[in-house]
Amino acid sequence: PYNFITRKDWQGSLARIYAFVQKEREQYKENLILLDNGDILQGQPTAYYYNYIDTVSPHLCAEMMNYMKYDAGNMGNHDVETGRAVFDRWINTCDFPVLGANIIDTSTGEPHLPPYKVMERDGVKIVILGMITPAIPAWLSENLWKGLRFDDMEETARKWMKIIREKENP
């Protein structure tokens, strides 16, 4: 793990993060929101195993995230790097929505993933909008994401914020 606040490596594992999250849940109860911002499918030997060796079982990363009770996830470029079969299997195993407002299915013109999730905590309506870098085509071979398009994040945010304000009224 990496601490983006201190910009230093963070010694630990998902087990350590789970212990931290459980402690926070004791304090904040149902008001705690647990999100993943992507790239869960790379960097660990266990992820590699379920990405490329055991391609039939439910993906361990999804199983761990389900156990930890994530509220929502987001696609990262390293998740796309594993290829459609792997990341679609991971998404389909998750008990929570994996978001991607700017990941467009080219056959339908619609988002490949749910664009956002609505939650209510302590009487406050919260909307989580998920997006991925649109640089995927410049970074990764098309065979990894064939049938998808990655739209501009700013334009996508404007579009979906209008829809969210009108439809969800957060």
Regions from the language model: what does each represent?
Residues 1-170:
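Acidic, metal/ion-coordinating pockets
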